[in-house]
Amino acid sequence: MPDSTALPTTIPVCPVRGSVIYPTMVQHIDASRAISINAIEAAMSGEKVILIVSQRDKDVDDPKGEDLYDVGTACNVLRVRKNPDGTLQMLVSAVARVQVSAYQLGDYLTADIEPLDAGKSGGVELQALSRELKDKFETVASGGRINAESVQTINSKDDIGEMADHIAFNLDFKLEDKQAILEAANVTERLKKLLTLLDTEQEVQAVQAKIRAQVKEEIDKNQREYYLREQMKVIQKELQGGDEEEGDEAEAFRAKIDALGLNPEVKKEIDREVNRLARMHPDAAEASVIRTYLTWVTELPWNERSDDRLDVEEAAQVLDEDHYGLEKVKDRVLEFLAVRRLRKERAERGEISAEEVNKGPILVFTGPPGVGKTSIAQSIAKSLGRKYVRIALGGARDESDIRGHRRTYIGAMPGRIIQGIRTAGTKNPVILLDEVDKLGSSYQGDPSSALLEVLDPSQNQHFTDHYLGVPFDLSEVMFIATANYPEQIPAALMDRMEVIEFNSYIEQEKLEIAKRYLLPRQLLQNGLKPNQISFSDAALEKLISHYTREAGVRNLEREIGTVARKVARNIATGKTKRAKVTDKELEKYLGQPRHTPETENMEDMVGVSTGMFYTPVGGDILFVETSIMTGKGGGLLLTGQLGDVMKESARAALTYAKSNAERFHIDREKLDNSEIHVHVPAGAIPKEGPSAGGAMATSLISALTGIPARHDVAMTGEMTLTGRYLPIGGLKEKVLGARRAGIKHIILPKANERDINDIPLHLRSSMRFHPCETVDQVLDVALVGGLKALETPRTDSQVTPPADSGSKGRKTGRRSPEARA
């Protein structure tokens, strides 16, 4: 076989993965790839010389020349054996380091080679490097990384270059480092590189030894603690008269705590309490306190979660099944869920952190009672597949309601948030903070301030309940709040929430809700079958308009339940087998109607204008009546339980009339010598708000000029002394009330024109809206003859005196309290 001086210039190539062969070594090589098998067979049919060279990337299955290093080892093939599976096992003897000048690819790789020039080496430097290499190798070998036989073989080498090759082969260096040793043909350079690698290996061995010592110390410590703990259990058992259950109590808590997967800081604090319990007599008063505390801690879901179902289509289906209408609310909820789904998908791809998934606005549902705020929160939890917890905050006056009591107090308990988490059994429930606008405050603290930490996404992952004394992560909880009056929510708390407004239901929506949800539920609750009772649409419409007066449907469901119970009684006593409830038969079941809707005037009247108001239970119209009494000078009398703001609107209207007296041809002498009385029925109901300014001005100017106000026009808007007409709120509810009263024309501020789109289309198409920017424009629509009649001089015969009875031609119905104009 050829030696290093007689190698062929072109030889077959056998690529290998993850290993390097050095000269003078004898090595087995397994070949399974076609390119390697073909090269071995070519070598055996030729001069039995083959080039062993490493791949740069071991994952390449079909290597080409560029995938291989340029320095390899020329080897003599000693023996080849074919395995039953077709693979080959080759025994080679490495001859020399060679430089590859070019690779050629056919059925197998061949290489043009030439031996590497070793250069000159020797002298004192080589001797010093040799001694240093032997010393470092002995140090590394003493660490047990090389077996004794290999150490003996290496130490027996007389050639220092050959010794260096064997050291590099036997130590666990990276492929790049082993290849660098192969490419170092000069012995001096080879020793320098190897010494650098041995220095690194020594440092690694030192760190490993330190880690092993620490692990051994920790194991010894745990074994010692276990031994002492077992001794304590035996001693406690003897002290307690053999009561094994008491002796195992601390251990039972410890086992539960270990299973919770707490972070080290929290676990350290809780373990301290367990150790205190273990040292106490079980009948000690403090032991009972600690026992209760540990029970709370171990029952909290520190790492238990519900799997989110963020299917937007399924959520939409659930919301539609559970609620009728509320389209804007549903759209916002679905947008919220869609954003959370996209965030979760990005977190799964590693594009954002897991903490970012749960960040987002805290939703607060605002609106009158009974419009579905609480039930839609339940539907959100249902669609997400999360547990649902409702926390009623109405009347809460103590900070401890939120944060809990400190354990120093007798009967201390966690706050309602932690109690809700334990009730849910998961750390990511949907928690409804109900009636958040009705939080109180006292000398014991302000619960709304405590809620700031709960609802702040940047703080609530470290929420600390006073009772627990350790942080609990609330960042995965989905908080939803509800309120009837958002203006009563503290500003700092409101700033952390996004408002979703629930409007009052219109009569058509109530009718559909009654047929789809309320009737089936009441039939089920009262034991009736659908074929035993039926309601006509006219009966339900009369129930809505004459027996209930609300924005939602709670009272409507109660009235349906009352009818259902009476029918159930008749069926149970055999008086009837089934009942069909019509509008004419309602009085038989419910008595006389309790509400008579306000209706428009039947004729145009002087001094009587029609305004609009709304309350939490819906909107309606009101009448502003003005009477002029001569003989007493310059006074303004206001009656009808008007609030301060409404009184100021009347004074502003009078000032506006006086400042425009000449233009409107108002008798100034009569004005100065008359007392003006403004009354707003019904007098038993408090009224407040600025939006009656237009109605006040129309009524006053109508009375002062004798020009009648139109009976088919209702108005809302705030006026200024300069005659501007300013925007107001609650337009939808007011218009719905006006339409119910038969009004066809609505005067509203120009700035509120955009709110007309919130009114259902079938109502908008049956009414006419008059957006106004000034009071002059209001008067032009509201008075008979308009602004032209005002600005035209009038004789006494043309002036119609104000009617003595402001109620002529209409009937006055009952209104809900706290009407806001």
Curated annotation (Swiss-Prot):
Record has ATP-binding as a keyword: yes
Assigned EC number: 3.4.21.53
Active site annotation, chain numbering: S691, K734
GO cellular component, one term: cytoplasm
Cross-referenced InterPro entries: AAA+_ATPase, ATPase_AAA_core, Lon_bac, Lon_bac/euk-typ, Lon_lid, Lon_proteolytic, Lon_Prtase, Lon_prtase_N
Keyword annotations of the record: ATP-binding, Cytoplasm, Hydrolase, Nucleotide-binding, Protease, Serine protease, Stress response
GO terms under biological process: cellular response to heat; protein quality control for misfolded or incompletely synthesized proteins
Record-level Gene Ontology MF annotations: ATP binding; ATP hydrolysis activity; ATP-dependent peptidase activity; sequence-specific DNA binding; serine-type endopeptidase activity
Stretches assigned to the Lon proteolytic domain: 603-785
Catalytic activity: Hydrolysis of proteins in presence of ATP
Regulation: induction: By heat shock.
PROSITE patterns: LON_N (PS51787), LON_PROTEOLYTIC (PS51786)
Subcellular location: Cytoplasm
Region (Disordered): 792-821
Binding site for ATP: G367, P368, P369, G370, V371, G372, K373, T374
Pfam families named among the record's database cross-references: AAA, Lon_C, Lon_lid, LON_substr_bdg
Domain Lon N-terminal: 11-202
SUPFAM superfamilies recorded: P-loop containing nucleoside triphosphate hydrolases, PUA domain-like, Ribosomal protein S5 domain 2-like
UniProt-listed CDD domains: RecA-like_Lon
KW Cytoplasm (keyword) present: yes
Similarity section: Belongs to the peptidase S16 family.
Assembly mode: Homohexamer. Organized in a ring with a central cavity.
NCBIfam families, A to Z: lon
Described function: ATP-dependent serine protease that mediates the selective degradation of mutant and abnormal proteins as well as certain short-lived regulatory proteins. Required for cellular homeostasis and for survival from DNA damage and developmental changes induced by stress. Degrades polypeptides processively to yield small peptide fragments that are 5 to 10 amino acids long. Binds to DNA in a double-stranded, site-specific manner.
Protein's UniProt name: Lon protease
Gene: lon
